[in-house]
């Protein structure tokens, strides 16, 4: 499949609507996320590495908010624990349809994957050894986030993990501004114009709410996790691994 270039915000828009994962976004998503999220490829590759270490025989691995299935593919190609499977969930029908197409091209003798088009907050999590939330929690209203962490914790087997990747905020204003500016420089270096950066930011401001690493770690501790280790950060994007 040819990767299409993201030009969704290249022309001036009179009315900027809230960002949503519709067919237009799905068509350019691989290009969009590679050019927008510093270290995305490294995060995806190492989700596979981490999942391979913690996947338990006979358990489920969940990719909640799987989009086109990049993390699912990384886990599928790395996990060797017997009788494991992956349950990949997204609430965008367009994302699930395209993920199904991409997974069908991955013809190796890997562990089975079930794709579900569903609200991840309604999915039963049970007998889990690995749960992935890769840039997903930030789109869930903050008052609902602790309940989701508690559900994930309850569904994990002892020794299981949650991999949580997020755009993050900073408590000090000067630190926050520095990382915003560095991220914008990253996007410019990847070919986005100032107009595209500004319009995309306006589309996201009401639907994506970042939090500090400390807030994430405190919430994970409240949910019951024994530790929540920051294993990756590049500018204002980070990933943690939390262990039950």
UniProtKB/Swiss-Prot annotation:
Gene Ontology molecular function terms on file: carboxyl- or carbamoyltransferase activity; S-adenosyl-L-methionine binding
Catalytic reaction(s) noted: prephenate + S-adenosyl-L-methionine = carboxy-S-adenosyl-L-methionine + 3-phenylpyruvate + H2O
InterPro entries per record: CmoA (IPR005271), Methyltransf_25 (IPR041698), SAM-dependent_MTases_sf (IPR029063)
EC number(s) per entry: 2.1.3.-
Broad EC category: transferase
Example of a GO biological process term: tRNA wobble uridine modification
Gene3D superfamilies on file: Vaccinia Virus protein VP39
Family matches, as Pfam families: Methyltransf_25 (PF13649)
Stored SUPFAM superfamilies: S-adenosyl-L-methionine-dependent methyltransferases
Residues annotated for S-adenosyl-L-methionine binding in this entry: 40, 65-67, 90-91, 119-120, 134, 201
Alphabetic keyword roster: S-adenosyl-L-methionine, Transferase
Biological role: Catalyzes the conversion of S-adenosyl-L-methionine (SAM) to carboxy-S-adenosyl-L-methionine (Cx-SAM).
Family membership: Belongs to the class I-like SAM-binding methyltransferase superfamily. Cx-SAM synthase family.
Subunit structure: Homodimer.
Name of protein: Carboxy-S-adenosyl-L-methionine synthase
């Amino acid at each position: 499949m040819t990767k299409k270039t993201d030009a969704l915000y290249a022309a001036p828009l009179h009315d900027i609507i809230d960002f949503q994962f519709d067919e237009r976004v799905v068509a350019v998503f691989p290009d969009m996320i590679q050019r927008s999220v510093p270290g995305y490829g490294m995060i995806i590759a190492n989700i596979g590495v981490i999942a391979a270490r913690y996947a338990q025989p006979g358990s489920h691995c969940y990719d909640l908010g799987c989009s086109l299935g990049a993390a699912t593919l990384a886990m599928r190609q790395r996990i060797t624990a017997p009788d494991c499977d992956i349950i990949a969930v997204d609430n965008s029908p367009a994302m699930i349809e395209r993920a199904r197409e991409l997974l069908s091209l991955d013809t190796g003798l890997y562990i089975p994957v079930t794709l579900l088009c569903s609200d991840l907050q309604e999915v039963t999590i049970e007998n889990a050894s690995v749960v992935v939330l890769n840039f997903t929690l930030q789109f869930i209203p903050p008052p609902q986030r602790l309940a989701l962490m508690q559900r994930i914790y309850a569904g994990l087997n002892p020794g299981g993990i949650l991999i949580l990747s997020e755009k993050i905020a900073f408590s000090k204003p000067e630190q926050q501004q520095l990382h915003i500016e560095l991220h914008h420089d990253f996007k410019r270096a990847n070919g986005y114009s100032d107009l595209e950066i500004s319009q995309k930011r306006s589309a996201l401001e009401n639907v994506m709410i970042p939090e500090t690493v400390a807030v994430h770690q405190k919430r994970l501790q409240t949910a019951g996790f024994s530790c929540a280790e920051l294993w990756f950060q590049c500018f204002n994007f980070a990933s943690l691994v939390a262990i039950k």
